[in-house]
Structure formats: structure tokens, C-alpha cells
From Swiss-Prot:
InterPro entries: Ribosomal_uL4, Ribosomal_uL4-like, Ribosomal_uL4_dom_sf. GO terms for molecular function: rRNA binding; structural constituent of ribosome. This is Large ribosomal subunit protein uL4. The keyword Transport does not apply. It comes from Exiguobacterium sp. (strain ATCC BAA-1283 / AT1b).
């Protein structure tokens, strides 16, 4: 079983915690990780792009000149695609880019992301995390004591508004609860800070 140091809010070690081998100790599957990241990014696309076809462009209802006798090529509308200002042929239309990988694949990707973080010493486990009031300086002090200098993901057992408000003005810091742990957030952050209770909840959900 992988072991990591158990720290308090001041960054001092107060013990060790054993992580479940089946969740935090597997061999990461990079191919599945890639597929899961692409899936999440695709689902976040707005897909609101739109172009107008010849039937949607304003104007062009009248034939620009008679069919025969002018010496010019026949034309039916000034909004035909070959005209400047005409409609677009097969242009993009609004659509959803989201799709879902099989459940087993998504689970394997999440386990791979968690295990990769453990192997790279990018997981920090806190004995607890609590503030009397949602003050940014308190969260900044905790991150400073943990030597977190870049992007960090803070995972709590349940949604904690005080912690979320304390962290929202700190660039690069994201707070989620254990139920919201996902591959993209894990991979996108340099450090992942779990509370002890959050680890237990993640292990319970993924067991």
C-alpha cells in the first residue's frame, strides 16, 4: 500500500496515512488518461458556432438579371455561395461535442490519474482543513506552509463554503468536494491537497 505523510495546516507531519492500493497504487494507463481528458474537454466546448446558408442570408429573393440574352453567366440569386456576401456551403452549425466513454474506462482513467499523482509525489494529505471565517490570507498561509507555489487542487470530503470562499481569490487554486474529483482537474494541477476525510470518501466511492 502506498503511504504518504499526514500533515496539519501548518505543514508539520503528524503521522502517515496508507492509501488503498487498488485506487492510488495501480500502473497508470496513459492512453486511457488521454481519452478521458479529450472527452472532458470536448464536453466543455460551447458548440455555438453558426454560419448562414443561402436561405438564411438577408436578401437575394430576386433574380439579378434575366436568364438569357445578357451574355453573362446565368444567376438565380445574389446570395448564392459563389457571390460575395452569399451563403456558406456546409458551414458549421450549433451542435454538442459531448460524448461519454464507457463507465469502466472512465473509472480506470480516474484511478490512473490518482495513482500518477502519488507516484510523482504530487499528493498532500491534511489531517483536517478548517477556518473560522472565509479569509483569503488564511488559505494563502496554509498553501505557503505546504510549499504550494503553483496550481493546486483542494479536495474536501463535502462542499465547504468557507474553504471555497477563502480560496476563490487565489490564482490557480481550485476547490472541489470528493464527489467531484475528475481526471482533468487532477492532471491540470501541480499539487492535489486532500483532507483525510476526503481520501476516505474517494476510497469509499471508488472501492
Amino acid at each position: 500500500m502506498p503511504k504518504v505523510a499526514l500533515l496539519n495546516q501548518t505543514g508539520s507531519q503528524v503521522g502517515e496515512i496508507e492509501l488503498a492500493e487498488a485506487i492510488f497504487g495501480i500502473e497508470p494507463n496513459e492512453s486511457v488518461l488521454y481519452d478521458a481528458i479529450v472527452m472532458q474537454q470536448a464536453s466543455r466546448r460551447q458548440g455555438t458556432h453558426d454560419t448562414k446558408g443561402r436561405s438564411e442570408v438577408r436578401g437575394g429573393g430576386r433574380k439579378p438579371w434575366k436568364q438569357k440574352g445578357t451574355g453573362r453567366a446565368r444567376q438565380g440569386s445574389i446570395r448564392s455561395p459563389q457571390w460575395v456576401g452569399g451563403g456558406t456551403v456546409f458551414g458549421p452549425t450549433p451542435r454538442s461535442y459531448s460524448y461519454k466513454l464507457p463507465k469502466k474506462v472512465r473509472r480506470l482513467a480516474l484511478l490512473s490519474a490518482l495513482s500518477s499523482k502519488v507516484q510523482n509525489n504530487e499528493i498532500i494529505v491534511l489531517e483536517g482543513l478548517a477556518f473560522d471565517a472565509p479569509k483569503t490570507k488564511d488559505m494563502a498561509a496554509v498553501l505557503n506552509s505546504l510549499s504550494v507555489e503553483r496550481k493546486a487542487l483542494v479536495v474536501t470530503a463535502d462542499y465547504n463554503e468557507t474553504i471555497a470562499l477563502a480560496a476563490r481569490n487565489i490564482p490557480g487554486v481550485t476547490v472541489i468536494d470528493a464527489a467531484g474529483v475528475n481526471v482533468l482537474d487532477l492532471v491540470a494541477n501541480d499539487k492535489v491537497i486532500f483532507t483525510k476525510d476526503a481520501v476516505a470518501k474517494v476510497e469509499e466511492v471508488l472501492a
